[in-house]
Amino acid sequence: MAAMTAIALSLAPLVSASAAGGAPSMDANTDITDQTSLQSGARVFVNYCMGCHSMEFMRYSRMAQDIGLEEDVVAKNLMFNTDKIGDSMTIAMQADDASGWFGVAPPDLSVIARARGVDWLYSYLLTFYADSDPARPFGVNNLMFPDVGMPHVLWPLQGVQSYVKAERPADVDSEHIEQLEADDKGIRVRTAVTTKDGKTTHVLDMLEVTTPGTMQPGEFRKAVRDLVNFLDYAGEPAKLVRFEMGYWAIILLAVFAILARALYKDYWRDVH
């Protein structure tokens, strides 16, 4: 219980800050029964997220079993902080050091998908963009989480993304993002702009990759989807068992219904 409380408190700044602003989420379309996706997501998590974020409720051995990897493969490719397959996915970084470097200790991500939802996480990881404001400590901002304090750790894959805004009226009073939509060039940002006289116009902004990374936009979105899929699985591994049991339960009920129908017809054959 103490561990759950600590994680909930560590996630509180993320939840409250994102709730105060941001944009509507895009659909993540994850599927935790897709083992190939889970394996890809685990690889991205270990290589790009686990330098700062732990996942202490997940053990390497459980992960290997659930996502279809041999333990020796996990030990060779996904374990860098321990040599014991039964250990939890913790990190070497100390919370005090992290607070000094980032202003706040990066949260454990064991239940982040349950706290924020897969659609929000997917959209958040796709909408980092370069921000030259000196107040931005890592030179980036985020549409889902304005004034984010986290660096864009996936930039080697995505590249540097710029927020290209369409022309606005001169007397803008307020504006808000209505929809995000991914395409081959980047992410279309449909924005409603209200002027001081109360009139609202709609403009189309863009998030565009201006300095390419190692992946094309479609490839990067797939990598992010796989990562979010893995985070969704990690938040509740028992869902995999429930899904499998559910399939068998449906099959059993279907067979029972067929047998019950046949028995019913046999009982009433002479009556009719």
Regions found by a protein language model. Name each.
Residues G68-D183, D205-F220:
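Electron-transfer interface patches adjacent to heme c in soluble/periplasmic c-type cytochromes
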Residues I7-A17:
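C-terminal segment of classical bacterial N-terminal signal peptides
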Residues E208-G246:
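Short, aromatic-rich amphipathic segments at membrane interfaces
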Residues T36, S40, V44, R116, ...:
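Extracytoplasmic/secreted proteins, especially bacterial periplasmic and envelope-associated proteins
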Residues F45-E56, L227:
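The canonical Cys-X-X-Cys-His
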Residues R242-H272:
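Juxtamembrane interface at the cytosolic side of transmembrane helices
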Residues M1-I7:
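Bacterial N-terminal signal peptides that target proteins for export
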Residues A17-R43, S54-Q65, G235-F243:
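Electrostatic cytochrome c docking/interface patches
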